Amino acid sequence: MKARAAVLSLALVLTACGADPPDYSSLLTSPPTTTTTNTSASDKPQPIAEYLYGLGVTGEQVPLDKLTDLTVTLPKPTGWTKYANPNFSPGTTMIAKNNTYPTAMVVVLKLTGNFDVAEALKHASVDAEMNQNFTKLNSSNDTFDGFPSAMIEGSYDANGKRLHTYNRVVIPVTPAPKFQRYLVQFTVTTLADQAAAQSDDIEAVIKGFTVTVK
């Protein structure tokens, strides 16, 4: 698949709000000439983007309103608005309450290349766990809307603040004959000391998030 123009890093997506999202920039480039599964003895956790890239998988970021065979719904509670930033990678959708925390972000990548979905999802939470002083509160490997998925919830330190995050990766696939795979990244972030006060809105966003095949 052709590389995206400028190959913008998704690590820039939440810079303005102080969070540290997964970096999928490697998937927006051409794959390595020799692909491996990286079976070295190193104990260093491998993020899902790095894992997929090592298998030669590439991805094209697709805005939510440009998806033709998939529908991804990001609900917007009262008081939440679209959060725009020129540093965002093209196609990123982010909303925020009163232009600050809490925030919700969705990134969709159209994938090219074969890989073991179950194995890939073992790497889905690594980015979150690599955040500074990350403390896991909850996790799940249950399917989401009928698709393979991994979720992790926890708190971490960033820019002098303690943040609470809910992070879900979903890997849907369209029916035959296309069998097109996507990677959907959904992240909700708020200040940890405001998580209880903002729980109604956060719960509404999480419960309203859906992934369906058209």
Tell where the protein language model's regions lie, with residue ranges.
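Short acidic-hydrophobic surface loop/beta-edge motif
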Residues: 58-68, 93-97, 140-143, 154
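Extracytoplasmic/secreted proteins, especially bacterial periplasmic and envelope-associated proteins
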Residues: 119, 123, 201-204
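Solvent-exposed loop/turn segments at secondary-structure junctions
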Residues: 111-113, 156-159, 190-194
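Extracytoplasmic
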Residues: 67-69, 101-103, 147-149
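A short acidic-to-branched-hydrophobic micro-motif
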Residues: 93-119, 166
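Signature of long, low-cysteine stretches enriched in small and polar/charged residues
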Residues: 125-177
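Short hydrophobic/glycine-rich mini-motifs in sensory/regulatory modules
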Residues: 177-184
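N-terminal targeting sequences that direct proteins away from the cytosol to non-cytosolic compartments
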Residues: 1-91, 178, 189-214
